[in-house]
């Protein structure tokens, strides 16, 4: 009887911990992406205009592909 109650308490605790961890991680990621949004083409276009460059479609595509390639290399 005591072993069964111990196992039940352990299972309930593990489930509660998993649910709390999921929602905690979800809230953290939402906050992180609000503070640090991923770079998109519109942001690159604005940065290029601020630097005095004319943002052509070719340049934007080159910059986006180089950023994606750099992200892939850094993940390895």
UniProtKB/Swiss-Prot annotation:
Family: Belongs to the UPF0154 family.
Source organism superkingdom: Bacteria
InterPro entries in alphabetical order: UPF0154
Keywords (A to Z) from UniProt: Cell membrane, Membrane, Transmembrane, Transmembrane helix
Claim: Transmembrane is one of the keywords in the record: yes
GO cellular component terms given for this protein: plasma membrane
Topology relative to the membrane: Single-pass membrane protein
Region spans: Disordered: 55-76
Signal peptide extent: none
Protein name per its UniProtKB record: UPF0154 protein LCA_1273
Transmembrane segments: 3-23
């Amino acid at each position: 009887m005591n072993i069964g109650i111990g196992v039940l308490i352990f299972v309930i605790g593990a489930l509660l911990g998993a649910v709390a961890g999921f929602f905690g991680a979800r809230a953290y990621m939402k906050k992180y992406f609000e503070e640090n949004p991923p770079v998109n083409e519109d942001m690159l276009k604005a940065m290029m205009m601020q630097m005095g460059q004319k943002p052509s479609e070719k340049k934007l595509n080159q910059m986006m592909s180089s950023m994606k390639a750099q992200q892939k290399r850094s993940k390895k």
